[in-house]
Amino acid sequence: MRKTFILLTALLLAAAFFPIYAQRITGTVADAKGQAVEAATVTLFRSADSSKVRTTSTDKAGHFAFDRIPAGNYLLSASSVGYSTVWSPPIDHSNPGATRTVPPLILASPVVTNLKEMTFVAKKPFIEQKPDRTIINVDASPTNAGSSAMDVLEKSPGVTLDKDDNISLKGKQNVMVMIDGKPTYLSPAQLASYLRSLPASAIDQIELMTNPSAKYDAAGNSGIINIRTKKNKTKGFNGSTNLTYSQGVYAKPSGSVNLNYRDGKANFFLNGGYSPWEGFHDLDITRKYLDADGKTINSIFSQQTQIYSANPTFNLKFGIDYYLTSKTTLGFVVSGFRDKEEDHTSSNILLLDPQYNLDSIVNSPSTNQTTWKNGAINLNFQHSYDPAGRELTADLDYVRYGSLSDQYFDNLTYSPAMIKLGESILTGHLPGTINIYTAKTDYTRPLSDGYKLETGVKLSYVNTDNAADYFDVVNEVAYVDTTKTNRFLYRENINAAYVNMTKQYKKLNVQLGLRLENTNYSGHQLGNGVSVVSHDSSFNRSYVNLFPTAYFTYTLNDKNQLTLNYGRRIDRPAYQDLNPFLFFLDQFTYQAGNPYLQPQYTQNVEASHSYHHFLTTTLNYSYTRNYFTETFDQSGQVMIDRTGNIGSRQQAGISLSAQHSLTGWWTAILYSYLYYTRFSGLLYGEQLDISATTLLLNLNNQFSFHDGWGGEISGFYRTKGVAGQIVLYPFGQESAAVTKKIFHDKASLKLAIKDIFYTNRPHGYLNFQQIESTIRNARDTRLVALTFSWNFGKLLKGVNPRGHSGAGDEESRVKSGGNGN
């Protein structure tokens, strides 16, 4: 392993001395006023016979580039809706290995006889399909004005949320969500809160990667969702603000502000958001305990639980980019997130005999107050050597999480005549800290004959310290509960290196990659525990893995493209899931960690066909070994909810994604995914074999009218599915919105109704360990929301999509408090 790691590191260092042979033609497209023209079509022709070589489009800054162009003489044409076509002078590109930058191509507006009857719009499509990712261009949809990041995600193809706000991509959980290439370090509930406070106006693109390249951390069996925020390079001061008032059963106001200032060589930005969130969660659970024959009912457990949650969250991010030269940038970013959650739970449990006669009643009021304080510091460096694309980047990160949870549980038992039979009171005090240190560097270099090299290394160190102090309260005197009090220490080090090589043939693009990751970790449990936990134990583990990736893209013609990709990935358990503590929900239901969790490994294969940027058809297959997910283990009368390895998961499916402008004012976007999922393995001494064929439908209708009016009708529906031991019933939701631009299109108002028919209520059941259980959920999901968004200062130009963090996989593995309402 050491030799391999040294070899890959040496490759990174040696690459800096390789000569460049990048045949490249670059330039810009602007209008008569010198303003950049985005999404202009630029075509390269051979001068000799006027045959077309290649076509591309300009970015937000009007830039375009043609890579790996053979020596010769060429012509360029540039066009855009609302402009006449312009041609370049002849281009002599006979110097091998040179990069030729042509003078700006200036588009002049044509003469239009009746402008009142004609409106020209040149923009990117809402959804773009690339060989290795799906790109959501947020600004391409006018109805995204006044929306949040979560709103855009929920209508993105293949993205769904479960009852706990866990994000899935194409039916698979454990997706890594990143902001500007940086994992969020947040629990599903905290992440959902943050995404709802992040305005869509601050987002440039959302990238959906089901099979990321070797450049990315190998973690995340279902891939990566990367949210790229806008970053203004225009001199002066500008910003945006977003204010939302949502009303369901409880009010959910939120607000955010994004500020940017550039003067000279320094660029400053400040982003903040606050949401005093309130909500509810109604949970009904019925368990039928069966005899050994698996049919005869022995007893029945019926529980109705109401949870009220108040969860004010605050996030802040400040950064500086200093442009040492036109090629070199230094950056500093500091960010923080504070989440103070308070849950008040009322649980009423009926214990029944097989004939449904009442045996006893247990009433369990409880409170849980949890505070999370997350902070992160990042230093970053970027140097572009030349226009050919040679680049070096580096990141240093430190992240710290502090949490404190105080719990109170009161269990009162009554007879059917409501005579009090007993009472037990338990309190808990659970402090915890997580420290993450990472360093990474990436190097990109175009080579001769159409090759491109990417390579890099990453080091990460993590340590966690979690304690659980529980006390039994008898006659108002607290006694230490030694069977539950515990402390858990965890250490982890991951060393990684990767190399990617890309080759462009005439119609075929090939990218091959290999990532090596060496993982070393240890855990030490002090004190006492139950179930899978020993009284005092420790473990040390180490393993080395190789993660190959391969991408093949073949362009049949201007309208048809074929892609095939393969990748191997890993998912490591969240740090808290390795912690053997018990978290009490009520007298009969616990949550627990599992120090024996093993990482899971996934093989992904995808093949797709894209037609005219309109229809994309994809076939996929994945196989996961040592798959871990939420499991349920019955121990006497107690149901223990913990993450466990359940064996294997297989998934095969076909998806169709299409977008089409039905009229000049109506665009429809359809996504459908039909997939088969099977879970099989040995779990808690019993064979598990469960499967289902599921259909996911997502339809989004966008309307753009005159005078700044717009609208949207969207919805999704998912048929019966499976998730580990649980069979999921069908569910979906329908939403609608209307928008109006005001203040000369610098601001907008949006009125939205979410979950109109209140159908987003996931239900499920499981049949395992001689137990039949049904679970029904209801949350505060039907909402009416009014949003005001305002962009002030100079218009956003020159977006720099580069994120500032190297702490990728490590951040996504932090789980924290959150009710998921």
Where is each model-derived feature located?
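Short, acidic, small-residue-rich periplasmic hinge/interaction motif at the N-terminus
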Residues: 41-45, 79-81, 97-142, 162-164, ...
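Short, acidic Ser/Thr/Gly-rich low-complexity loop/linker segments typical of extracellular
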Residues: 47-63
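N-terminal periplasmic accessory domains that precede
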Residues: 104-106, 149-152, 191-193, 208, ...
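Outer-membrane beta-barrel translocator/receptor signature
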Residues: 218-225, 233-284, 310-315
